[in-house]
Amino acid sequence: MPIKKPCLKLNLDSLNVVRSEIPQMLSANERLKNNFNILYNQIRQYPAYYFKVASNVPTYSDICQSFSVMYQGFQIVNHSGDVFIHACRENPQSKGDFVGDKFHISIAREQVPLAFQILSGLLFSEDSPIDKWKITDMNRVSQQSRVGIGAQFTLYVKSDQECSQYSALLLHKIRQFIMCLESNLLRSKIAPGEYPASDVRPEDWKYVSYRNELRSDRDGSERQEQMLREEPFYRLMIE
């Protein structure tokens, strides 16, 4: 006689967790958007920041002729196969990730060496919030190259918090740093270069422009420009 087995039904309802109750992994950009108002208000509570200007910095000719050398805690690397000279702080101040935010500085081609001389004290400053930057070796680019007529300097911004987030203090320092770069160039009457079509900038920036390289491309478009102008990082720099 067959054994009658009890009818067992597994209740799956208890295993189905409502999706909205699961903390979703937000992107760094979404987190920055969510914290925008808080950061905006915190930034405005900080006083003006004054950067100590580095002394004994190299000239543009020095870094063009060097292969690998250390200046003011920055390793300068100039490979013959690269049109850029790279600078990277040996002991980074920002320990977070690079999430695509960067600035370009565009200078008239013939004034790039002079612009470097004007900005080098800030770029090599121990107070600089920029751990990594690069500059075009003008001897290696054509007359009409994108990084010859503009965008000769690139400043890479790294986050300093968990989940690739920026602290209000770092954002404040970056804002102030960009203002100092702009004012030094303007005061020295340096001629601006052609800023990249891929970037955005407010009307009062004459040399510096912004781009997030993870959410844009070099070609640029109206749609990309609008998107970049809505980037929370960019808005926190200009508003």
Swiss-Prot record:
Compartments (UniProt record): Secreted
Control of this protein's activity: Inhibited by the tyrosine phosphatase inhibitor vanadate.
UniProt-annotated catalytic positions: 104 (proton donor), 134 (proton acceptor)
An annotated GO cellular component: extracellular region
Inducers of expression: Transcriptionally activated by MxiE in the intracellular environment of the host, in association with IpgC, under conditions of deregulated or active secretion. Expressed in a VirB-dependent but MxiE-independent way under conditions of non-secretion.
Pfam family, one: VRP3
One MF annotation (Gene Ontology) recorded for this entry: lyase activity
Alphabetical UniProt keywords: Lyase, Plasmid, Secreted, Virulence
Major location (coarse): secreted
Effect on the protein upon substituting residue 131 to A: No change in Erk2 phosphothreonine lyase activity
EC code: 4.2.3.-
Function per UniProt: Catalyzes the removal of the phosphate group from the phosphothreonine in the mitogen-activated protein kinases such as MAPK2/ERK2, MAPK3/ERK1, MAPK8 and MAPK14 in an irreversible reaction, thus preventing the downstream phosphorylation of histone H3. This epigenetic modification results in inhibition of the transcription of a specific subset of pro-inflammatory genes, and ultimately to a reduced immune response against the invading pathogen. The diminished immune response enhances the bacterium's ability to disseminate and multiply within the host.
NCBIfam families in the record: PRK15245.1
Protein family according to the UniProt entry: Belongs to the phosphothreonine lyase family.
Official protein name in the record: Phosphothreonine lyase OspF
Organism of derivation: Shigella flexneri
